[in-house]
Amino acid sequence: MGQKINPLGFRLGTTQSHHSLWFAQPKKYSEGLQEDKKIRDCIKNYVQKNTRLSSGVEGIARIEIQKRLDLIQVIIYMGFPKLLIEDKPRKLEELQMNVQKELNCMNRKLNIAITRIGNPYGHPNILAEFIAGQLKNRVSFRKAMKKAIELTEQADTKGIQIQIAGRIDGKEIARVEWIREGRVPLQTIGAKIEYCSYRVRTIYGVLGIKIWIFIDEE
């Protein structure tokens, strides 16, 4: 049996960097981890409630958190930042207040910044949201996967692999379906591979979506 390792953890320090940058004493480490989860969940929930896209995509690629003694700096990498910024000028302030309320941090300042990423569909999180939206609307899984591959080809990637698992199309027995286009060298540490695993609730139950995107080789 092949041992499956997470492609992001496998490449930490070479082609991947950490999404949380801070130090803590061993006793306080779990608190810092919970704080990060609260921040990410709060931001995702806010974006979900306040942005409405026909494709059902929120457009968050990743959320980076940097902490100092007196400051928490949060950078949201978005594919479609206009949804959050241009709609209402006060949305960012409102989001900041929501996160501060959730954390209940009085001694530290919180700063949230938004960075736009080029080629949003070249990022697996945004692509997984797109596929999830299609599956919720009862589009055939093959059609959804092929459309996702077309979108990544426009983003100038070298290869993609998509896997969907669960009760696909409402069938009684759960199964795994996958499709690959181009090269996806999972064993090459120098290969820059983006990966995400995403859960979507459909009327037939929960489906798991996994996406590997090969961007470049060092």
From Swiss-Prot:
The protein's name in its UniProt record: Small ribosomal subunit protein uS3c
User: Which Pfam family, just one, is annotated for this protein?
Assistant: Ribosomal_S3_C
Q: Which gene encodes it?
A: rps3
Subunit arrangement? Part of the 30S ribosomal subunit.
Please give the superkingdom of this protein's source: Eukaryota
Listed under GO biological process in this entry are: translation
Q: Which SUPFAM superfamilies match?
A: Prokaryotic type KH domain (KH-domain type II), Ribosomal protein S3 C-terminal domain
Keywords of the record: Chloroplast, Plastid, Ribonucleoprotein, Ribosomal protein, RNA-binding, rRNA-binding
Q: Where in the cell is it found?
A: Plastid, Chloroplast
User: What is stated as this protein's family in its record?
Assistant: Belongs to the universal ribosomal protein uS3 family.
Extract one GO molecular function annotation from the record.
rRNA binding
| rRNA-binding listed as a keyword | yes
Provide the species name.
Answer: Gossypium hirsutum (Upland cotton)
PANTHER family under this entry?
Answer: 30S/40S RIBOSOMAL PROTEIN S3 (PTHR11760), SMALL RIBOSOMAL SUBUNIT PROTEIN US3C (PTHR11760:SF19)
The residues covered by the KH type-2 domain are: 43-118
Tagged with keyword Chloroplast: yes
GO CC, alphabetical:
chloroplast; cytosolic small ribosomal subunit
